[in-house]
Design a protein with these regions (language model features):
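Bacterial Sec-dependent N-terminal signal peptides
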Residues: 1-32, 383-386
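A non-transmembrane, solvent-exposed segment enriched in polar/low-complexity residues
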Residues: 21-174
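N-terminal targeting signals for export/organelle localization
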Residues: 95-97, 107-108, 168, 176-247
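Structural microenvironment flanking redox-active thiols in thiol-disulfide oxidoreductases
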Residues: 287-326, 336-345
Length: 386
């Protein structure tokens, strides 16, 4: 028994010694490309959310093997891009790009078969790389679904010889459902992987307009993690800026100058539902949405729905003309200073159209909803049977 215990103890010591000899100042990737064909060059690309750049390159050996040793200032997303000789980095096709996450001390093994049309690859030695591979499966699955749907729609449109609104109405619900399903699947992956960088990179694929409350909450959960990763910290700072004007928070008060030169305060709408509608006369999407806003105002104003239009125009005459032309009969104000106005800065307006719906208690209850989504929200809020 003593000899057996000694042998086990010696094995543990040997294992500890081997691991202690690993180089923690850099990470290593040992790769194998089976059936490489014309593929000769491999590029290591740093690809976090702040930059994308080639940091190293090498040539495949005759046996399809390659190796990278690279110092990572922090755990980060990288891509392996495999291309043909003489074609440069751009010669690599989209299917010959593989994601991984690496940090110093990682000893990663990578392999793929160039003859495999599914572009399956195996990666060992990095749990985060396995997770980013899992996320890519989700992304590719829904991407392929919508690509097929778009191709089918385009084929039928070509047969008709024109784009058809009725045909679009047939395909659009499925397209939107696929996007919604994708968002739900990604959000689940993100919340299941809060301690992994893979979760963060998945989160950056979500539309902040549609998933703002979830992304703000996620940012709070991870801000103590990955402190040395600039991409993560930039995301955290962005969410902290948005948070005060995110859904569920009190809308910050402001005073804006009305079209008649008199001050308008958000506090004037205390106890009422009001939509802050940020727009401009020069904004084509805003002008396209205005007929819908006019329609909803006509339907719900008598039920308690108010609008305060806030223009990003600098030209008062153009602003006034757009109000008259589009028949916008609600109150209007502007700082006449585009995105640099104090109201726009307070509400972190970076694109228009943008809107905030505020309830009688002064809470932001919806943001950036347009078209049918705006009508559905108002129907639900004011208990109108659809």
């Amino acid at each position: 028994m003593k000899l057996k215990s000694l042998a086990v103890y010696s094995l543990l010591l040997l294992t500890a010694f081997i691991y202690s000899c690993k180089d923690s100042s850099q990470f290593t990737i040992n790769g194998t490309i089976k059936n490489p064909g014309s593929l000769r060059l491999v590029y290591l690309i740093e690809a976090d959310s702040t930059q994308i750049k080639v940091v190293d390159s090498t040539t495949l050996g005759e046996n399809g093997k390659f190796q990278f040793k690279h110092v990572a200032p922090y755990a980060n997303l990288y891509k392996l891009r495999i291309g043909s000789a003489g074609g440069g980095e751009q010669s690599a096709g989209a299917n010959n790009v593989f994601d991984l996450i690496a940090k110093n001390g990682d000893d990663i093994e990578f392999s793929t078969d160039n003859n495999d049309n599914t572009h399956t690859y195996i990666i060992k030695g990095s749990d985060d790389s396995e997770k980013i591979k899992e996320f890519n499966k989700i992304s590719n699955f829904y991407g392929e679904k919508n690509s097929k749907l778009v191709a089918e729609y385009q084929e039928k449109s070509q047969k008709l010889g024109k784009q058809s609104d009725s045909l679009l109405k047939v395909y659009m619900p499925t397209f939107q459902k696929n996007l919604a399903d994708y968002g739900a699947a990604v959000l689940k992956f993100v919340n299941d992987n809060k301690t992994s960088l893979a979760g963060f990179y998945a989160a950056t694929s979500l539309d902040v307009y549609k998933f703002e409350p979830q992304l703000v909450a996620y940012s709070d959960d991870i801000k103590a993690n990955f402190k040395d990763n600039p991409g993560v910290q930039t995301f955290v700072r962005q969410m902290e800026k948005i948070k005060p004007v995110s859904i569920g928070h009190k809308a910050p008060d402001f005073t804006v100058t009305g079209i008649d030169g008199k001050p308008i305060k958000l506090a004037d709408y205390k106890g009422k539902y009001v939509m802050l509608d940020f727009w401009a006369s020069w904004c084509a999407p805003c002008r396209q949405e205005n007929p819908n806003v006019v329609k909803q105002y006509a339907a719900f104003n008598s039920k308690g729905f108010n609008i305060l239009g806030i223009s990003l125009d600098k030209d008062k005459a153009a602003w006034q003309k757009a109000i008259n032309d589009d028949k916008l009969t609600w109150a209007h104000g502007s700082d006449l200073n585009s995105f640099e106005g104090p109201t726009e800065t307070l509400y972190h307006i970076e694109a228009i159209p943008s809107n905030f719906i505020i309830d009688p208690q002064g809470n932001i209850v919806a943001k950036n909803i347009t078209g049918a989504d705006l009508e559905a929200f108002l129907n639900k809020t004011f208990n109108k049977v659809q």
